[in-house]
Amino acid sequence: MLDNTRLRIAIQKSGRLSDDSRELLARCGIKINLHTQRLIAMAENMPIDILRVRDDDIPGLVMDGVVDLGIIGENVLEEELLNRRAQGEDPRYLTLRRLDFGGCRLSLATPVDEAWDGPAALDGKRIATSYPHLLKRYLDQKGVSFKSCLLNGSVEVAPRAGLADAICDLVSTGATLEANGLREVEVIYRSKACLIQRDGEMAQSKQELIDKLLTRIQGVIQARESKYIMMHAPSERLEEVIALLPGAERPTILPLAGEQQRVAMHMVSSETLFWETMEKLKALGASSILVLPIEKMME
């Protein structure tokens, strides 16, 4: 039995978002053993319970108020939202923030030897998918009628098996499509993981914990997107050097022992530092350039 005084978070037990979700919670300082087969794991250092479930179940658990938070792909969330609306329900939830993992796209794909001149080419065709509501919404907007073939897995084999003329499925690299004689022809939905919260009144202690968790998540994401940079640079070219490195704040400038014309510069850059940027820094006279990852960050 779940304790209602503890914050309940649902994550995917196994699959595309599972490892990244667990890593995010760990980097937020939540100490929990997620290597067992138990469906409910209790945090050691916070009043938090983690429910490990199928990703399809997470939106419903949040919308029905069974859990307080859920980490889920936007594609699964939107499909469940459309499904419930089609049944006359009025599902409610709050999207707290988009996360920095789980990126994918839901796309239409057809056999490589078939011509494609837009969605109209699918009029009257049979399309295999695990996302019937997202597919219907998209093709309804295009004025295309079709027959849906609902599959919960191995969607890409449907055309070869004679089950469908085309498919609508998640794509990351496109290698699976190519292996099955298909080509991606149209992206209908782009998705990333997101953090959602149940609608309705929340106990103050839980809300304070959610606010703390959001601050930590923001810090984790900022840290992943930032780098700590150290270098020696000529004093007269500091502004040119800084212009190459967009940062959260102005850099720290320190004198160099025995050097009158050069200084040490430390800063956090909010953009990826490419080799081309480092070469430009060197051309401006910078030396001893170090680029380091950041584990945690709070502004």
UniProtKB/Swiss-Prot annotation:
Tell me which domain of life the UniProt entry assigns to the organism this sequence originates from: Bacteria
Q: Where in the cell is it found?
A: Cytoplasm
Q: In which pathway does it act?
A: Amino-acid biosynthesis; L-histidine biosynthesis; L-histidine from 5-phospho-alpha-D-ribose 1-diphosphate: step 1/9
Question: Does the record bear Magnesium in its keywords?
Answer: yes
Explain what switches its activity on or off, per the activity regulation comment.
Feedback inhibited by histidine. Also inhibited by AMP and ADP.
Q: How does it assemble?
A: Equilibrium between an active dimeric form, an inactive hexameric form and higher aggregates. Interconversion between the various forms is largely reversible and is influenced by the natural substrates and inhibitors of the enzyme.
The name this protein carries in UniProt is: ATP phosphoribosyltransferase
Gene source species: Salmonella typhimurium (strain LT2 / SGSC1412 / ATCC 700720)
